Amino acid sequence: MELTAVLLLLGLCSAGTVLGSEHETRLVAKLFKDYSSVVRPVGDHREIVQVTVGLQLIQLINVDEVNQIVTTNVRLKQQWVDYNLKWNPDDYGGVKKIHIPSEKIWRPDVVLYNNADGDFAIVKFTKVLLDYTGHITWTPPAIFKSYCEIIVTHFPFDEQNCSMKLGTWTYDGSVVAINPESDQPDLSNFMESGEWVIKEARGWKHWVFYSCCPNTPYLDITYHFVMQRLPLYFIVNVIIPCLLFSFLTSLVFYLPTDSGEKMTLSISVLLSLTVFLLVIVELIPSTSSAVPLIGKYMLFTMVFVIASIIITVIVINTHHRSPSTHIMPEWVRKVFIDTIPNIMFFSTMKRPSRDKQEKRIFTEDIDISDISGKPGPPPMGFHSPLIKHPEVKSAIEGVKYIAETMKSDQESNNASEEWKYVAMVMDHILLGVFMLVCLIGTLAVFAGRLIELHQQG
């Protein structure tokens, strides 16, 4: 008994399905019996077909800064009334809506005017939804590649204003009028991008009159998108490494010159920076229209490192100067030895006195004492017969030569130590100056744009 009931129920369902399919089959056959897809769906040729266009943005696929192309995944919703596709639902088993292939009916040839690809028209022919009043809804998916003027001046803290201009290709406003469904695109199903965020999106309808036909309006709907780049990726992978290279360059001046590793560290930093720039160059928009902020900062970092190498060479040269090759000017001694160390609270290096020593070693009277400390004979005059003795006189000349040589060596050592001290003072000054320049340079490049974005909210 139960089996019989189940079979009866299945039979009724199958009969309903067959009847429903039969009604739709009769309806489609009746609608398209004398239908032409090339004729505008109006009762009078003077009537205007009203087409409502809505744009649903699904995904921002790519922004090509070099070729200035924005690739988006969209759904283009189009609605209009076809005068020839109406019916009475009571005559067809209550069927009020049917789905039919879009290529079987008349369609407005809406295209993307600022298309940057080969296909201007929508080539994905999906089915349309048709109801008994003749109202048609067609929402084909499309991949739009639209031209957009990319301004990279503030990259990576930039905003781009891109647009999509939609309109009919062959129909003017006197036969087909397109109207926006809303004053902004539908973003309800938009999938967030990891690089861009849409701050604002608006749509406007335009009447355009061309010189060929000044009395005929051509209508288009233009959607504008204000997109702001998310800069975190570039901050972490480009800006922070460049900043660290700059600080590492400053530390060259903290390294003692005597260690002999100043130039090694400087060249190593330069080589590392060069390799780093070669790796990240593909991340920077390769356009000559403007120099982006990040390009300016990379250029600043390169100049900063090269300047440190040049100045390091000067400091090392100063450190190894000697009185035989360079005589220290008085202004250098006054500035770098007497003035700056006191201002900057350096511990002043102990230097030998520069007072002139008495060159005359012997006095008129020479007091000769016994080596053991016992009192010797009375003092003898310089012209004493003992002094005039050839052997004694030769010994005195030898002592005098040794004393003058020691004095000359001492003066030479003092002069060399003064040059080393000047180099040390220069290192301390340059350490502070380069740290300050690194900070000020970074702020000068990015602070203005960051403040502007903060004010915009």
Swiss-Prot record:
Keywords recorded for this protein, A-Z: Cell membrane, Disulfide bond, Glycoprotein, Ion channel, Ion transport, Ligand-gated ion channel, Membrane, Postsynaptic cell membrane, Receptor, Signal, Synapse, Transmembrane, Transmembrane helix, Transport
GO biological process terms on file: acetylcholine receptor signaling pathway; membrane depolarization; monoatomic cation transport; monoatomic ion transmembrane transport; muscle cell cellular homeostasis; musculoskeletal movement; neuromuscular junction development; neuromuscular process
Cytoplasmic face of the membrane: 317-428
Residue stretches in coiled coil: none
Membrane topology category: Multi-pass membrane protein
Compartment(s): Postsynaptic cell membrane; Cell membrane
Reactions catalysed: K(+)(in) = K(+)(out); Na(+)(in) = Na(+)(out)
Keyword flag Transcription: no
Residues glycosylated per entry: N161
One GO cellular component term: synapse
Molecular function (Gene Ontology), one example: acetylcholine receptor activity
Spans within the Extracellular topological domain: 21-230
The family this protein is said to belong to: Belongs to the ligand-gated ion channel (TC 1.A.9) family. Acetylcholine receptor (TC 1.A.9.1) subfamily. Alpha-1/CHRNA1 sub-subfamily.
Subunit structure: One of the alpha chains that assemble within the acetylcholine receptor, a pentamer of two alpha chains, a beta, a delta, and a gamma (in immature muscle) or epsilon (in mature muscle) chains. The muscle heteropentamer composed of alpha-1, beta-1, delta, epsilon subunits interacts with the alpha-conotoxin ImII.
Identification of the protein by name: Acetylcholine receptor subunit alpha
The organism of origin for this protein: Rattus norvegicus (Rat)
